[in-house]
Structures are given as structure tokens and as C-alpha cells.
UniProtKB/Swiss-Prot annotation:
Pfam families: MoaC
GO biological process terms on file: Mo-molybdopterin cofactor biosynthetic process
Species of the source: Xanthomonas campestris pv. campestris (strain ATCC 33913 / DSM 3586 / NCPPB 528 / LMG 568 / P 25)
Protein name: Cyclic pyranopterin monophosphate synthase
Tree of life domain: Bacteria
Family: Belongs to the MoaC family.
Length: 165
């Protein structure tokens, strides 16, 4: 029988079906981590141009700017996603590199010691970094595509998901 990976209940709805923030005050404080990925797909000519320019655009260093924007997004996730708790982020790391001739892979890993996980922070960081890459390159093409964006792993809560990074 496969491992259970979902809950039968939506945690952000109360008994009356109204939206609510989950009360984590009784949860155990543990080391938490999550890793998420997003990808940016480029037309062949744009990918070739970016490779030739060392991932620099007219706006500056693409990777450097994406890391800064993604990090800022991680720290502000609770301001963007209504029921995310503000968390003391202990670490945020990005790996950005080519994953094929035309695909830039963005991996964001977030760590904290708290009562709730950092999945949304990792997903937000990877997403905003991908959006920043798009913004940095849109002068070259508007046919770039972002996705998929997905959670690769999480550690430290009720259940671990995916391979640790």
C-alpha cells in the first residue's frame, strides 16, 4: 500500500467552513527544511544568446538578481500567502543552472527551527526567482515559459517528503 501523502481535511478551514490560520502553538519546535524547484524554458536562440553572454542581460546579472529577488520573497512569504505564519528564516540557498539546452533550473532550499514548515517559502522563493529571470530576459522574448514549479522535499514535520537535499 502506498504511503499516505495527503490529509482528508483542509487545515485552513474551520468547522464552519470559514478560512482560518492554523494554530501551531501546541506543535513541537523542530528543524524544518524544504526544497522547491521552478524552471524557465527559453526559445533556442534566446538560450544560445544567454549562454554566450554568461547569463547576463541588458539589466545585469540574471542569476545574481534572481537570487536576491528569491531571497526577498522567501522572507516575505507570509505577506503574500494569507495563512502563512511569519517565520524566522535561518537559511535560504539557491542553485541556478542549465538543465538542458533551453531550460534554466532554479532550486530553492529554505531552513528554520520552528513549529511549522517552510514549504511555501521554498515554493515562493523558486517562483519569484523564475519570474525575475523572465523579467530580466523579456526584452529578448515573450515566449519564455515558466514551469513546472514544484516541491521537491520537506523535512521536520509530521512527515518527510522527497529526498533530502
Amino acid at each position: 500500500m502506498p504511503a499516505k501523502t495527503t490529509s482528508a481535511r483542509l487545515t485552513h478551514l474551520d468547522d464552519a467552513g470559514l478560512p482560518t490560520m492554523v494554530d501551531v502553538s501546541d506543535k513541537q519546535v523542530t528543524a524544518r527544511s524544504a526544497t522547491a524547484e521552478s524552471r524557465v524554458h527559453f526559445p533556442a536562440a534566446v538560450a544560445a544568446q544567454l549562454r554566450a553572454n554568461g547569463l547576463r542581460s541588458a539589466k545585469g546579472g540574471i542569476v545574481e538578481t534572481a537570487v536576491i529577488a528569491g531571497t526577498m520573497a522567501v522572507k516575505r512569504t507570509h505577506e503574500l500567502i494569507p495563512f502563512c505564519h511569519p517565520l524566522p528564516i535561518d537559511g535560504c540557498r539557491f542553485e541556478i543552472d542549465w538543465a538542458g539546452a533551453q531550460v534554466l533550473q532554479i532550486v530553492c532550499t529554505v531552513r528554520c527551527v520552528h513549529r511549522t514548515g517552510v514549504e511555501m517559502e521554498a515554493l515562493t522563493g523558486a517562483s519569484v526567482a523564475a519570474l525575475t529571470v523572465y523579467d530580466m530576459c523579456k526584452a529578448l522574448s515573450h515566449t519564455m515559459r515558466i514551469g513546472p514549479t514544484k516541491l521537491l522535499s520537506k523535512r521536520g514535520g509530521k512527515r518527510d517528503i522527497g529526498a533530502a537535499r
